[in-house]
């Protein structure tokens, strides 16, 4: 697993902040926030399992617990005993699952900030995921990636940021993971319910 540590620039004993990305799974999603937040925190970002072109295939019964375990193992490896966490969409759900697992651990999650996460999938999000799955299955990775902005952003923002979006999409296409991994991650995400 690839992970990245950005030490706090202003204090040696700063708290840790773990960033967890959405469905794309790449640590680089958080790059725009690193400069300002690393003045207050030691930041850790990571690439989620199965999100790279050369990734091993994920198991057939991949689950949110597996994604949370990845973070737990990272915390143990880095010997982080207390931390804050910010998760976007899937990353927030990983945080919720991790919080449940940490109840029986000596590691403490001090706070969890959720951005566009949910406790149970609603009908609109289900429809978006169904469309994305159909695109990937029927039309392939390029259609899946090129349509992604339509599910995420308002039209005016897309028009104003078209070049940036296209560059990002081109990069995503070059490193697109195995389809089965995308389907496994989507299935785990779609079946999550906070209990």
Labelled PLM ranges:
Residues 16, 40-42, 81-84, 108-111:
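Structural signature of beta-strand start/N-cap positions in the alpha/beta core
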Residues 21, 83, 87-92:
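Conserved alpha/beta-hydrolase "nucleophile elbow" surrounding the catalytic nucleophile
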Residues 29-32, 36, 66-73, 97, ...:
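Alpha-helical elements of Rossmann-like donor-binding domains used by nucleotide-donor carbohydrate transfer enzymes
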Residues 123-125, 142-195:
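Conserved alpha/beta-hydrolase catalytic His-Asp/Glu region
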């Amino acid at each position: 697993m690839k992970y990245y540590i950005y030490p706090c620039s202003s204090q040696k004993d700063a708290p840790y902040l773990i960033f967890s990305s959405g469905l794309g799974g790449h640590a680089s999603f958080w790059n725009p926030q690193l400069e300002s937040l690393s003045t207050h925190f030691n930041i850790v970002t990571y690439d989620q399992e199965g999100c790279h072109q050369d990734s091993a295939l994920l198991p057939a019964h991949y689950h949110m617990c597996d994604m949370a375990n990845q973070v737990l193992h990272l915390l143990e490896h880095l010997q982080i005993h207390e931390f804050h966490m910010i998760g976007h969409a899937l990353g927030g759900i990983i945080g919720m699952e991790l919080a449940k697992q940490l109840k029986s651990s000596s590691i403490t999650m001090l706070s969890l900030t959720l951005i566009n996460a949910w406790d149970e999938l609603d009908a609109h999000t289900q429809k978006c995921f169904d469309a994305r799955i159909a695109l990937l299955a029927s039309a392939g990775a390029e259609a899946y990636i090129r349509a992604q902005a339509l599910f995420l952003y308002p039209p005016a923002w897309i028009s104003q940021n078209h070049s940036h979006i296209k560059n990002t999409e081109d990069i995503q296409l070059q490193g697109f993971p195995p389809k089965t991994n995308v389907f496994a991650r989507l299935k785990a995400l779609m079946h999550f319910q906070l209990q």
